[in-house]
A protein has these predicted regions:
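His/Asp/Glu-rich, glycine-adjacent segments
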Residues: 94, 100-290, 438-440, 444-451, ...
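A long, amphipathic alpha-helix that forms part
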Residues: 248-277, 282-323, 335, 350-363, ...
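Short, structured active-site-proximal loop/turn typified by the sulfatase FGly-forming signature C/S-X-P-X-R
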Residues: 51-104, 161-165
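Bacterial N-terminal signal peptides
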Residues: 9-22
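Low-complexity, glycine/alanine/valine/leucine- and proline-rich hydrophobic stretches
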Residues: 519-548, 566
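Polar, surface-exposed loop/tail segments
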Residues: 469-503, 559-562, 566, 576-610
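Secreted, luminal/periplasmic, and some membrane-associated catalytic domains
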Residues: 79-81, 103-112, 116-140, 153, ...
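Phosphate/adenylate-binding glycine loop and adjacent helical scaffold
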Residues: 597-660
Length: 660
C-alpha cells in the first residue's frame, strides 16, 4: 500500500450536508443566496476503501480529494451491505425505520418476475439487486418499499430532473417510483428513453426486452449484451477464484458502457439536476479476487479512469463550474479469512493452493454456512440455497486437511444434479416446520427469522451462537426482551416489527490481520469468493466520502464523524429541497458560503454500548471444533455522538466480542 492519501480521511462530508437540512432554518443554496442551485452528481464507487486511494491507482480521485472536501471519519450504515446503504443514500434514514434490509431478506408472500423475466422465488430469502424484484416487493408492501420519502421524489416534486445509472438494484432504488431517467445493467426507463437510445444507435441492456411488451419495444439483432459481466478466473478446481489473476476486471466493460451512455446522452441531452452513477468496481472485483490482489489494483485504475472521463466531459459541456461531484462508497471491504493459527495463508502456484506463506499468501478459509452449523447442532434451519461445493474456502487447516470433506451426489437426488458438494441443500420447503429458522445470508452479517416468533427457540438459538468463536455481535428484536449477551435491534436502528428479522448477527473480524498489504479480515457467508463486507468491523464500516465543486470548501479536511445517512440531507441542502423525515444531517461544516457552519459549533462524545449482562456458563468452540477456555460471551458497540444545537447524531464505529 502506498500513498499520499492514507492520511486524508474521507468521512465527515456527509455530516455537514445532512445537518443543513435537519437544523431549523436550513435551506438550499438557492434560497439562502438567491443563486441557482448547484447540479449534483453522486458517484458511488461500490466497496471503495479510503486507504485504497493512491497516486498510483487513483490519481483522479486523489486530486479531487486534495482540491475539495475530505471526510476523515465517514461511516457506512450497518449492516454494511450495498442495498442497506443504497436505502440510506435514497432517504437519509436507516434500515429499521425504512423497513428495508437488503441485500438478502425474507419476504414470504411476495410474487412477481425478476429482471430475466422468470418468476422470482420469494419462498427463499430474496436477492434485491434486481429492479424487477424491487418492483415486486414495492407492490407487496403496498407501494411503500421504503417507508420514508426519497431524495429523488423530493427533487422531482420540485421540478428538478434526475438520472439513476449503473449497478442493478442500488441505482434503481434511488428512483424506484420511476420519476426520472433510469439506466442500469438490466433496463432503460422510461420507454421513451429506451427508444431514444436505440434511435441514437446505442445497444440496450439485454434484459430490457423483459421490461416492456414486445409490441412496445424489441431489441435489434445486433444489440448484444453491453452490460454483461465477465467470467471469474478460477483455480484448477473450477470454482475457487484465482487470486493471482491479472486480467481485465469482470465489471470493467459494462461500467465503461454505462458511463459512456451517461456522458454521451444523459448528461448533455437530459441535463439532470441530480444524478446517481453507481458502478460495481472495486466491489465485485474484491469479492472475487480479494482486497490487495492484482485484479483489485486493475479495478481501481479502471474506476479512476471513468472519474477522469466524467470530469473532462463536465469541462467540455461547460458544466464544471456549477456541478458538485460527490464520490462515496457504500461500505468498506475485507478479505475473508479465519484465524491465522488455524488457517495460515497459502501460496497459489499454477492454479493450485500450495505451501504456507503468512507474509504474502492468500486466504483459504473464513467461509461459514450458518444453516449447516445450526443443523449439525440439532436446529431446523434453511438458507434458501442448494448444495454448495467450496473445496478451498471452506478451509485448509494448518495440518493441511480440509475442514469440510468433499462428498458426491451421484444421482442428483440431494443437490438436484450429480456432482461434488461440501454442504447439503437447505432450500426452504413448501411447508415450513414451526421450529424452523430461515437465514438470509448476507456476507459479514446474517438475518435469522423464526416465523412463529417462538421466544424459547430464539433464546436457545442465541445461546448456541454465543458459544461459537465466529460470532462477533448479536442483536435481537425488541419483542424478545432483554436476553443476556445481546442488544436490541433498535440500538443500531434495525428495529421493524413487521418486516425485520428476529436475530441479527455480525460475524467476527480481525481489523489488524493483513493480506496482500491491506488490513482487515472477517468470517463471512460461505462462497467461492475471497472478499466480503457486511460485518460490524471498522474496516467495513469506515468508507470513502469526498466532494468537490462550488458547494464545498476547497482543501478542507473534516475531522467530524459523518455517515452515508448524511448524504441525502446534504444533497437536499445543496438543491434547496426538504427531507423532513431524514435521520441524517447536512454536512454543513464542509459546505461553502452561507450554508457553512464552523467546526467549533459541534461536540463529539465517544461512548460504548454493551448488553446489560453477559451470557455465562457457555461451552465455547472454534470453527474447527476445538474448545475455547472462555465460558461467557459479551460484546461492545463503539460509537460517537455528535451534538449541535440540542440535536444529536450517532455514528457506529464497530461492534466486536468480549469473551471471558
Amino acid at each position: 500500500m502506498t500513498t499520499a492519501f492514507r492520511r486524508l480521511s474521507l468521512l465527515p462530508l456527509l455530516l455537514a450536508l445532512a445537518m443543513l437540512v435537519a437544523l431549523p432554518g436550513a435551506h438550499a443554496a438557492s434560497s439562502s443566496t438567491g443563486s441557482k442551485p448547484h447540479r449534483v452528481i453522486l458517484f458511488v464507487w461500490d466497496g471503495m476503501r479510503p486507504d485504497a486511494i493512491s497516486a498510483e491507482d487513483t490519481p483522479n480521485l486523489l486530486a479531487l480529494a486534495q482540491r475539495g472536501s475530505r471526510f476523515e471519519d465517514n461511516h457506512a450504515t450497518y449492516p454494511t451491505f450495498t442495498m442497506a446503504n443504497a436505502s440510506s443514500f435514497a432517504t437519509g434514514a436507516f434500515p429499521g425505520p425504512l423497513g428495508f434490509y437488503g441485500n438478502h431478506f425474507w419476504a414470504p408472500g411476495a410474487s412477481g418476475l425478476n429482471a430475466k423475466g422468470a418468476a422470482a422465488d420469494f419462498r427463499d430469502p430474496i436477492y434485491t439487486e434486481d429492479y424487477a424484484v424491487l418492483r415486486d416487493l414495492d407492490a407487496h408492501f403496498d407501494h411503500e418499499l421504503l417507508e420514508l420519502p426519497t431524495l429523488f421524489a423530493a427533487a422531482q416534486k420540485a421540478g428538478l430532473t434526475t438520472a439513476a445509472v449503473g449497478k442493478s438494484g442500488p441505482a434503481f432504488l434511488q428512483d424506484y417510483k420511476q420519476g426520472g431517467v433510469i439506466f442500469d445493467e438490466n433496463t432503460a426507463l422510461p420507454l421513451a428513453f429506451a427508444k431514444e437510445l436505440q434511435q441514437a444507435g446505442y445497444a440496450l441492456p439485454a434484459h430490457t426486452a423483459n421490461t416492456y411488451p414486445s409490441d412496445q419495444l424489441s431489441l435489434r439483432e445486433d444489440n448484444d449484451s453491453p452490460t454483461e459481466q465477465g467470467k471469474m478466473v478460477t483455480l484448477k478446481d473450477g470454482v475457487t477464484a484465482d487470486a493471482t489473476a491479472a486480467a481485465e476486471t469482470t465489471p470493467a466493460p459494462a461500467n465503461a458502457w454505462m458511463m459512456k451512455v451517461y456522458l454521451d446522452v444523459i448528461l448533455p441531452k437530459h441535463r439532470p439536476d441530480l444524478s446517481v452513477v453507481w458502478l460495481r468496481n472495486p466491489d465485485t472485483t474484491q469479492h472475487l479476487y480479494g482486497v490487495g490482489s492484482p485484479e483489485f489494483h486493475l479495478a481501481l485504475k479502471a474506476q479512476d479512469e471513468l472519474l477522469g472521463q466524467l470530469e473532462a466531459r463536465l469541462q467540455q459541456l461547460g458544466m464544471a463550474q456549477d456541478t458538485d461531484v460527490i464520490v462515496v462508497s457504500d461500505h468498506g471491504h475485507s478479505n475473508i479469512a479465519g484465524p491465522r493459527d488455524l488457517f495460515p495463508l497459502r501460496q497459489i502456484n499454477d492454479g493450485r493452493v500450495a505451501g504456507i506463506d503468512n507474509d504474502w499468501g492468500y486466504s483459504v478459509s473464513g467461509g461459514i454456512r450458518l444453516a449447516d452449523q445450526l443443523a449439525q447442532a440439532g436446529f431446523t434451519a434453511f438458507d434458501g440455497s442448494g448444495c454448495m461445493y467450496v473445496p478451498v474456502m471452506s478451509g485448509l487447516r494448518a495440518g493441511g486437511s480440509p475442514l469440510q470433506q468433499t462428498r458426491y451426489d451421484d444421482d442428483g437426488r440431494l443437490c438436484g444434479k450429480p456432482g461434488a458438494y461440501t454442504t447439503p441443500s437447505y432450500l426452504v420447503p413448501e411447508i415450513l416446520p414451526k421450529s424452523a429458522l430461515v437465514i438470509a445470508s448476507n456476507g459479514g452479517t446474517e438475518y435469522l427469522y423464526q416465523p412463529e416468533h417462538d421466544a424459547a427457540l430464539i433464546k436457545r438459538t442465541v445461546r448456541f451462537l454465543q458459544s461459537r468463536e465466529y460470532i462477533g455481535a448479536i442483536f435481537v428484536a425488541k419483542r424478545y426482551g432483554d436476553i443476556p449477551g445481546t442488544l436490541p435491534a433498535e440500538s443500531v436502528h434495525l428495529e421493524n416489527a413487521a418486516r425485520g428479522p428476529d436475530i441479527i448477527i455480525s460475524y467476527a473480524w480481525d481489523a489488524d490481520a493483513v493480506i496482500q498489504g491491506y488490513r482487515g479480515t472477517e468470517y463471512a457467508s460461505q462462497a467461492n469468493e475471497r472478499g466480503e463486507h457486511g460485518s460490524f468491523s471498522p474496516i467495513d464500516v469506515h468508507n470513502t466520502l469526498l466532494a468537490a465543486g462550488p458547494g464545498f470548501q476547497q482543501g478542507f479536511s473534516d475531522p467530524l464523524p459523518s455517515g452515508n445517512v448524511d448524504v441525502a440531507p446534504t444533497i437536499a441542502a445543496l438543491l434547496g429541497l426538504s427531507l423532513p423525515k431524514a435521520q441524517g444531517r447536512a454536512l454543513r461544516e464542509a459546505l461553502a458560503g452561507a450554508l457553512m457552519r464552523p467546526l467549533t459549533d459541534y461536540q463529539v462524545k465517544p461512548t460504548t454500548l454493551q448488553p446489560r449482562q453477559p451470557a455465562t456458563g457457555l461451552t465455547m468452540q472454534r470453527i474447527d471444533g476445538s474448545a475455547l477456555s472462555a465460558t461467557s460471551f459479551d460484546f461492545a458497540v463503539k460509537l460517537k455522538q455528535l451534538d449541535a444545537d440540542g440535536k444529536s447524531w450517532t455514528y457506529f464505529d464497530q461492534a466486536g466480542p468480549e469473551r471471558h
